[in-house]
Amino acid sequence: GCKKDRKPCSYHADCCNCCLSGICAPSTNWILPGCSTSSFFKI
């Protein structure tokens, strides 16, 4: 399974949508709109 939004993550598979700066981000994130279907970002 994937971790909840704002939980720490190391890989894309850790999150339901995307991982930014090591944190799971919600697909409704206004900074990365539609991140659930976008490329994986790890900054």
Curated annotation (Swiss-Prot):
Major location (coarse): secreted
Organism: Conus figulinus (Fig cone)
The protein's name: Iota-conotoxin-like Fi11.6
Assigned protein family: Belongs to the conotoxin I1 superfamily.
InterPro entries (UniProt xref): Conotoxin-I_CS, Toxin_19
Function: Iota-conotoxins bind to voltage-gated sodium channels (Nav) and act as agonists by shifting the voltage-dependence of activation to more hyperpolarized levels. Produces general excitatory symptoms.
Pfam family, one: Toxin_19
Disulfide partners: C2-C16, C9-C19, C15-C24, C18-C35
Domain notes: The cysteine framework is XI (C-C-CC-CC-C-C).
Tissue specificity remark: Expressed by the venom duct.
Subcellular location: Secreted
